[in-house]
Amino acid sequence: MFISTNEKSEIKYSRVLFKISGEALMGSKQFGHDMEAIGELSKGIVEVCNLGVQVCIVVGGGNIFRGTSASLSGCERASSDYIGMLATIINALILQNFLEKNLVASRVLSAIPMATVCEPYIRRKAIRHLEKGRVVIFAAGTGNPFFTTDTAAALRAVEMNCDVILKGTQVNGVYSADPKKNEDAVMYDRLSYTDLLTRDLKVMDASAISLARENSIPIIVFSLKGEKIVNIIKGQGTYTIVSDCKQ
């Protein structure tokens, strides 16, 4: 696809990692998958790929199974987390199919080997896929219990040398309180990593934020519903950026 010089000059990032929650795949449903919502999400990712940006994705599994919730109900935590990892593989395969319907080559790489349905995670192989213009979808989190997919996203972003972590949520940025419950909640345009930790703003868990901070990878929090993903790549639209850089 031809990319104009103006479009190239607008692109702020050359390699990005999207963190997509399982809930984002539910759409308006309470459980499972909303194929229309997944289709729209996939089209947004395709638009980013068409700009020549290298894209990798970490997908959650909360629309199918939540390990922490199950452990509170009596299921062993480690077992619950492994079940949650399997849920992320299901989501990754569905997302892969939608991307390939839009003629974007993609590969699912799982931290838990499952050779008949996806590739095992190998860092150098993942980077090679990105260099060839394929979308890489990381499944099964880190492959270890007790670590969230947020931590997996930060880890993979570091390993892939990504320019930014893009966290798509239900709201258009980071707020001082839940805007759905508190109409006085204030949205922040910019925060530092320390702000997230000290104010307990619940954007990502502490280990994910620490990994991003140690490796100077900014985190952008934006709405998957109200904002075109391609605008974020160009530095446009409404979002919160988490970084220690002042510019």
From Swiss-Prot:
Gene Ontology cellular component annotations, sorted alphabetically: cytosol
Catalytic reactions of this protein: UMP + ATP = UDP + ADP
Top-rank taxon: Bacteria
Record entry for activity regulation: Inhibited by UTP.
Family from the record: Belongs to the UMP kinase family.
Keyword Membrane carried by entry: no
Localisation: Cytoplasm
Protein known as: Uridylate kinase
Quaternary organization: Homohexamer.
Gene Ontology BP annotations: 'de novo' CTP biosynthetic process; UDP biosynthetic process
One term of GO molecular function: ATP binding
Binding annotation for ATP: K19, I20, S21, G22, G62, R66, T169, Q170, Y175, D178
Functional note: Catalyzes the reversible phosphorylation of UMP to UDP.
InterPro entries reported in the protein's UniProt record: AceGlu_kinase-like_sf (IPR036393), Asp/Glu/Uridylate_kinase (IPR001048), Uridylate_kinase (IPR011817), Uridylate_kinase_bac (IPR015963)
Major localization class: cytoplasm
Alphabetized SUPFAM superfamilies for the sequence: Carbamate kinase-like
Species: Wolbachia pipientis wMel
Keywords from the UniProt entry: ATP-binding, Cytoplasm, Kinase, Nucleotide-binding, Pyrimidine biosynthesis, Transferase
Pathway it works in: Pyrimidine metabolism; CTP biosynthesis via de novo pathway; UDP from UMP (UMPK route): step 1/1
Residues the entry annotates as binding UMP: G61, D81, T142, G143, N144, P145, F146, F147, T148, T149
EC number(s) reported in the record: 2.7.4.22
